[in-house]
Amino acid sequence: MRTLMIEPLTKEAFAPFGDVIETDGSDHFMINNGSTMRFHKLATVETAEPEDKAIISIFRADALEMPLTVRMLERHPLGSQAFIPLLGNPFLIVVAPVGDAPVSGLVRAFRSNGRQGVNYHRGVWHHPVLTIEKRDDFLVVDRSGSGNNCDEHYFPEEQMLILNPHQ
């Protein structure tokens, strides 16, 4: 099994998979009579159909035991999905390019600094939320509508990957 190298989460490195949601280096302007700075259009919510709706949820995720064997990835073919950390804890992101199935050799891993969120583009393969230190809360923006919006792919044993944030 291949051990994934964990990269720092940057807009440039993550661009093939979606948006990094962060204030550093983002467009902004003052509103509310100069008392509030708006960081504008940090990500775009994607939906497949006009009748689909963007919804906001909170996911409470328990920390996973590490190192972790990455056995599966999922994708959302009908809409984007954003995860914004609410408690400021670093978390991991595992992704693979859009395609009929994820290719084990193209899987990449990133570490958020806890102030960065991610918005997975439609169809991007990704691991479910990966909290590493303790229970964490995430604001999640995704799609509600008809149709199956979650495909799962399980790797054969020889294509499984190891994720070790402490290495």
UniProtKB/Swiss-Prot annotation:
Q: Which gene encodes it?
A: allA
Disulphides: none
Please name the pathway: Nitrogen metabolism; (S)-allantoin degradation
Q: What does this protein do?
A: Catalyzes the catabolism of the allantoin degradation intermediate (S)-ureidoglycolate, generating urea and glyoxylate. Involved in the utilization of allantoin as nitrogen source.
Family in the record: Belongs to the ureidoglycolate lyase family.
Q: How does it assemble?
A: Homodimer.
| EC class | lyase
Which GO biological-process labels does this protein carry? Answer: allantoin catabolic process; purine nucleobase catabolic process
Keyword annotations for this protein, in alphabetical order, are: Lyase, Purine metabolism
A GO molecular function held by the record:
ureidoglycolate lyase activity
Write out the catalysed reaction.
(S)-ureidoglycolate = urea + glyoxylate
InterPro entries xref list: RmlC_Cupin_sf (IPR011051), UAH_cupin (IPR047233), Ureidogly_lyase (IPR007247), Ureidogly_lyase_bac (IPR023525), Ureidoglycolate_lyase_dom_sf (IPR024060)
Q: What name goes with this protein?
A: Ureidoglycolate lyase
Query: What cofactor does this one take?
Result: Ni(2+)
Give the lineage: Bacteria, Pseudomonadati, Pseudomonadota, Gammaproteobacteria, Pseudomonadales
EC no. given is 4.3.2.3
Q: Which Pfam families match?
A: Ureidogly_lyase (PF04115)
